[in-house]
Amino acid sequence: MSKANVGINGFGRIGRLVLRAAVEKDTVQVVAVNDPFITIDYMVYLFKYDSTHGQFKGTVTYDGDFLIVQKDGKSSHKIKVFNSKDPAAIAWGSVKADFVVESTGVFTTKEKASAHLQGGAKKVIISAPSADAPMYVVGVNHEKYDASNDHVISNASCTTNCLAPLAKVINDNFGIIEGLMTTVHAVTATQKTVDGPSGKLWRDGRGAGQNIIPASTGAAKAVGKVIPELNGKLTGMAFRVPTPDVSVVDLTVRLEKPASMDDIKKVVKAAADGPMKGILAYTEDQVVSTDFVSDPHSSIFDTGACISLNPNFVKLVSWYDNEYGYSNRVVDLIGYIATRG
């Protein structure tokens, strides 16, 4: 079977890393990129050099309005570059880009993202939470994808992708009565380098490199959309911290069935080695955040950081590269829906 042809709208952090993940995984073919704010020579530069993930271990050049991305042992990608501000005006069909990754952060509703369908795309995957598009988390609920009705879908958030696999394993084995999540989250592009105005969210406007910033996140509540039996049982918040990448979920839950920490470790390890292999990982090492830069998993369970007050009340800790792990799941989700017709 031929590989799915993919277009990327928005060549920012996630757009570029989706392309890196696509090259590395070699399961989809990227045929187009649209970004109205970046010239093609600048795209080459931004893709080649990355302060967080390092220099691209291959070659990237351009020929006319095509990006050429190559890496030894992997398929090469000849990528048509568009520069349209209007998603409806991008000629995805001209390069047979059936699947479009919407990674601008702007067109996150079904109505806005469906503009890509006018240009010839068949499916749109929003690389962010969506207010109304169905959300799929690979390894958790991706098999509920409905090819005949789901033309615009969301890959949820990086934090939901970390939390949901862990919550599913714990809920399936022990039952979750209720829980609170905190994500200690790396900085992202929406934050300020120094103090500045930030609409109604005043704290978000404080200097990202100087502060631990409490922030809201819908990631825990979104798990209830992905795992319906947990709807209304989880909520959470975030602390933005001055690190460039890698975040960590702290999930504190009350369990229906009592469980020792060893019981919990066993079921998480079984899932990581079995049905969630490649999505959920498991470590007993004395790790810190930089150990997970460029880690392709959604969630890496840290046994040494977990604690238990009693067999029904536990705190569980799981790491994630909020950029690269998430981008890998975007590619996996496309690979899956491409097989569903």
Curated annotation (Swiss-Prot):
D-glyceraldehyde 3-phosphate binds at S157, C158, T159, T188, T217, G218, R240. Pfam families: Gp_dh_C, Gp_dh_N. Keywords: Cytoplasm, Glycolysis, NAD, Oxidoreductase. One of its GO terms (biological process) is glycolytic process. NAD(+) binds at R13, I14, D35, K85, N322. Pathway: Carbohydrate degradation; glycolysis; pyruvate from D-glyceraldehyde 3-phosphate: step 1/5. The record marks H185 as: Activates thiol group during catalysis. It is an enzyme of class 1 (oxidoreductase). One of its GO terms (molecular function) is glyceraldehyde-3-phosphate dehydrogenase (NAD+) (phosphorylating) activity. The active site is at C158. GO terms for cellular component: cytosol. Its EC number is 1.2.1.12. It is found in: Cytoplasm. It catalyses: D-glyceraldehyde 3-phosphate + phosphate + NAD(+) = (2R)-3-phospho-glyceroyl phosphate + NADH + H(+). It comes from the Eukaryota. Belongs to the glyceraldehyde-3-phosphate dehydrogenase family. There are four nearly identical glyceraldehyde 3-phosphate dehydrogenases in Caenorhabditis elegans. Homotetramer. PANTHER family: GLYCERALDEHYDE 3-PHOSPHATE DEHYDROGENASE, GLYCERALDEHYDE-3-PHOSPHATE DEHYDROGENASE 1-RELATED. This is Glyceraldehyde-3-phosphate dehydrogenase 4.
